[in-house]
A protein has these predicted regions:
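Membrane-embedded beta-barrel scaffold of Gram-negative outer-membrane proteins
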Residues: 355, 361-379, 554, 560-566, ...
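Short acidic/polar hinge/loop motifs at secondary-structure boundaries
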Residues: 183-211, 583
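Transmembrane beta-barrel wall of Gram-negative outer-membrane proteins
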Residues: 247-276, 281-317, 340-358, 441, ...
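Face-selective signature of the C-terminal outer-membrane beta-barrel domain
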Residues: 301-310, 343-520, 552-554, 564, ...
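Extracytoplasmic beta-strand/coil segments of soluble accessory domains associated
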Residues: 114-115, 123-187
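N-terminal periplasmic accessory domains that precede
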Residues: 78-82, 109-116, 139-142, 161-167, ...
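Gram-negative outer-membrane beta-barrel transporters
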Residues: 496, 609-622, 637-732, 776, ...
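C-terminal beta-signal and adjacent terminal beta-strands/loops
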Residues: 617, 657, 668-669, 722-738, ...
């Protein structure tokens, strides 16, 4: 934010290339204001700022040096820009430094497009700058600089992303609103928010994370927003090819190939990604195919229309979970040879953007999903509830044939939605401001069916009702969902340093559950004596308002203080309620969760020497849903009570070269620290032995540190993470003794530490990347699964190697 008096000012001009000709599609930014524009076909730009003052004007396009200039303006100003072409022989260190300066590492602007981020805790991952195992979506490396994240690791090559934070269950990132290029990608935003699809890191330019205050603009989730921003088409090129071929341990193979370019007003980006591996445990191989296409038509400098389509299919074998005893004896052991998981995902979106002026913008999108997921496996004898679902053998007869059939769960997802946003800058009675008004309509109709699968070993996802009519885990449900929301935020610039951003969100949610389940009774000899089909139809209709308030205060030219309080709400995921499992039961009286998120912090505005963000937070969680265990080792999911989670989050990235005042343009040496101290307690609960206990999924210390280094075309990264122990259930249970049916299901996750080392070397159009994940070969686990891919302990991947060859033309 500049230092200003109240007036309306236009900054305009023409951008020229190295030959003195007007240059189109150059990004023009006025730093720290959120004001930006792309030059038109005549190279012209025109930006308006609400206040006079000192600003930094930035112009950037690929292949040219960044133009940066401090300007002091008090009236309309004309500034022409002459770009200087980059040398073809620049080293990788210099190129990455250029990108860092353009994108202002680690922060979202106050306003970006039709979105407001003022006063919100947010973080941005610049994926191109990561030196790590992007071929396998290694979450430890990709998300290493996002504070306080708790990551589930399953050794599945990054097919699914499971992250949480601040006491939120990491399972499939279900406590975040997950989006791709701004639209929803989960099976059902309210009824089934789990993320089965995760874009490959090689296709991403940014990963944007906005914490709990994102509830007002994006949805009511406590975790906030994760937005995967895909690479954009290469400007100034008709065709750009990037081919990345990777190999690694456990017969890992990845082939990522993309094409992009701009032809006249049409630009495009498309890729195909194939990935496969045998897995680090027996019976844990997978194959994945993913394709994506983005087309954008730029009618003029003010109006564009884009279409994108995503397809994903993968088949993964699952090794099953372990008991604590099994893990201690052999952490890569597998006693499940015929468990499978399959995904088929189709996403499409149409996005329209129009700038009425430099002050007023409109965006409208339509998106939809058609998808399926199937899980098949043996998880213990469903009739004998007194046996261990983790340790029980998958029995065979004397001929070597399996005795029991497998359990099959099939889900079909159909949803579509629209989102409309209008953002405008204005001036009212001498006070500048920015307002955002938006609306979203979302409708889904999903089905979930559970029943007897085949008795074989292959990935056969067909039900076998005729052979097993009395299979106890049978259900067939349809889940229609309807959601309408209206939201708004407004930035009031009180003076040159202080801004206030109130906001609201109105939600109307109508959820239905229509279906039947089988109630099967057995005698002592496990023979069926009764099989009754029970009808279970429910409907939930609710409307409510959420409010929030954000504050931001500029502290000199290099830092900003921010504060935010926001209401949050999380709908019960009804599509899971009637899924029957030998070890998983849902309380029929379960209700929605609600609460508040508060952030207070200070962060850097410039990143030349030190990029930092230090904050404290609080999260009040009422009617928090958790899991208790009954005396048969069944996990019962229900509303546990009121929980309070609080802590401090510290991030710092120090550029040692800059701090030493050395003019070493060919050298990179950065050290980062990423630390979260978190405490928690259940304040109230109707359950015995819960009040006063710590909230599950919260390590008291979540510490990550590392060094990123480089010399000319050689880049490197070494990082180390440590998480203290964390509980996995609301009663803070200790590990069950050997022989107890709950062994592997209850108990804390022990503290663990992991180290990763990666290198990258660039030469002209080629790049070689290589590294070692889990350098010290630490045996540890991050998860006790309640169901698939377990139940039980899911070991994390042992030491592995990878090498990637990239060719770019």
């Amino acid at each position: 934010m500049g230092y200003f008096s109240w007036s309306q000012i236009e900054v305009s001009g023409i951008v020229y290339n190295e030959k003195g000709r007007p240059k189109e599609r150059v990004e023009i930014h006025i730093q720290s204001t959120g004001v930006n524009q792309m030059t038109d076909g005549s190279g012209r730009y025109g930006l308006e700022v609400a206040e006079a003052g000192i600003y930094k004007l930035i112009a950037f396009t690929y292949g040219y040096q960044i133009f940066e200039k401090l300007i002091q303006i008090s009236s309309d100003t004309l500034i022409d820009i002459a770009l200087v072409k980059l040398s073809q022989d620049l080293s990788e260190v210099v190129i990455l430094d250029q990108k860092q300066r353009v994108f202002n590492l680690g922060r979202l602007n106050t306003v970006e497009g039709t979105r407001i981020y003022a006063g919100k805790k947010n973080e941005v991952i610049l994926v191109d700058q990561i030196v790590g195992n992007k071929a396998s979506n290694n979450a430890r490396q990709v998300y290493s600089q996002i504070v306080g994240l708790n990551i589930y690791e399953s050794g599945d090559g990054g097919l699914q992303l499971s992250i949480g934070g601040r006491g939120l269950d990491p399972n499939r990132s279900a406590n975040f609103n997950t989006r791709q290029n701004g639209y929803d990608i989960s099976p059902d935003v309210l009824g089934y928010p789990e993320s089965y699809y995760t874009p490959p890191a090689e296709a991403l330019s940014q990963i944007q994370v906005v914490r709990g205050a994102a509830a007002l603009q994006y949805g009511t989730q406590f975790g906030g927003l994760i937005n995967f921003k895909m690479h954009q088409p290469a400007p100034g090129k008709k065709l750009e090819l990037i081919a990345r071929q990777s190999v690694g341990s456990f017969n890992f193979l990845s082939s990522f190939n993309s094409l992009s370019g701009t032809v006249g007003k049409l630009s495009y980006y498309t890729y195909f990604h194939h990935k496969q591996s045998d897995g680090f445990r027996p019976n844990s191989g997978y194959k994945s195919n993913n394709t994506f296409t983005y087309l954008n038509y730029q009618f003029n400098s003010e109006t564009s229309l884009s279409f994108e389509y995503t397809y994903l299919n993968y088949l993964a074998q699952q090794s099953g979970g372990l008991t604590d005893t099994q893990f201690d004896l052999d952490p890569i052991y597998s006693n499940r040879t015929r468990n499978w998981f399959e995904i088929d995902w189709n996403l499409a979106a149409l996005n329209f953007n129009h700038n009425f002026s430099s002050k007023t913008k409109l965006s409208a999108m339509i998106f939809g999903l058609v998808a399926e997921r199937n899980s098949l496996g043996y998880r213990g004898n469903p009739i004998n509830l007194n046996s261990s679902p983790v340790a029980e053998d998958d029995y065979k007869d004397q001929n070597g044939d399996f005795i029991y059939n497998r359990d099959l769960i099939a889900g079909v997802f159909r949803n579509y939605g629209t989102e409309l946003r209008l953002l405008s800058r204005y001036k009212l009675k001498g006070t500048a401001g920015v307002f955002l008004l938006g609306t979203k309509f979302y409708k889904s109709r999903n089905t979930a069916k559970q029943g007897p699968g085949s008795i074989g070993i292959d990935a056969n996802f067909n039900f076998n009702y005729e052979r097993y009519p009395d299979y106890p885990n049978q259900s067939d449900f349809t889940f229609p969902n309807l959601n309408f929301s209206l939201f708004g935020e407004n930035i009031f610039f009180i003076n040159e340093k202080f801004a206030v951003t109130p906001g609201f969100r109105f939600e109307h949610i109508f959820t239905e559950s229509e279906g039947v389940y089988s109630e099967v009774l057995f005698d002592i000899a496990q023979n069926p004596i009764s099989n009754v089909e029970q009808i279970d139809d429910r409907s939930f209709n609710r409307s409510f308002m959420l409010f929030g308030l954000g504050l931001s205060h500029t502290i000199g030219p290099k830092a900003e203080g921010y504060a935010n309080i926001s209401q949050n709400y999380r709908s019960v995921t009804f599509s899971d309620i009637r899924t029957v499992s030998p070890t998983f039961i849902v309380d029929p009286d379960i209700t929605d969760e609600q609460g508040y998120t508060v952030d207070l912090g200070i962060r850097s505005l410039t990143t030349k020497t030190l990029n930092f963000d230090v904050s404290i937070f609080g999260l009040l969680y009422d009617d928090r849903i958790g899991i208790i265990l009954d005396d048969r080792a069944n996990r019962v999911r229900k509303n546990i009570g009121e929980a309070f989670i609080y802590g401090m989050e510290i991030f710092g990235d120090l550029n040692l070269v800059s701090s030493l005042n050395k003019d070493w343009k060919e050298v990179k040496l950065n050290v980062f620290i990423n630390t979260a101290f978190t405490e928690s307690s259940y304040l109230a609960s109707e359950e015995n032995n819960v009040k006063g206990k710590k909230v599950e999924f919260i390590p008291m210390l979540n510490f990550k540190t590392g060094v990123n280094f480089g010399f000319r075309n050689l880049m490197g990264s070494l990082q180390w993470i440590y998480l203290s122990e964390q509980f996995t259930d609301v009663e803070n249970s200790t590990i069950a003794v050997d022989g107890d049916n709950r062994n592997g299901l209850i108990g804390e996750i022990p503290s663990y530490h992991v180290m990763d080392l990666s290198f990258a070397y660039s030469f002209k159009n080629f790049k070689i990347e290589s590294g070692i994940n889990n350098l010290m070969n630490t045996f540890y686990f991050t998860r006790r699964a309640t169901s698939y891919p377990g139940p039980g302990i899911i070991p994390s991947e042992s030491r592995s190697f990878y090498t990637t060859l990239q060719v770019k033309f």
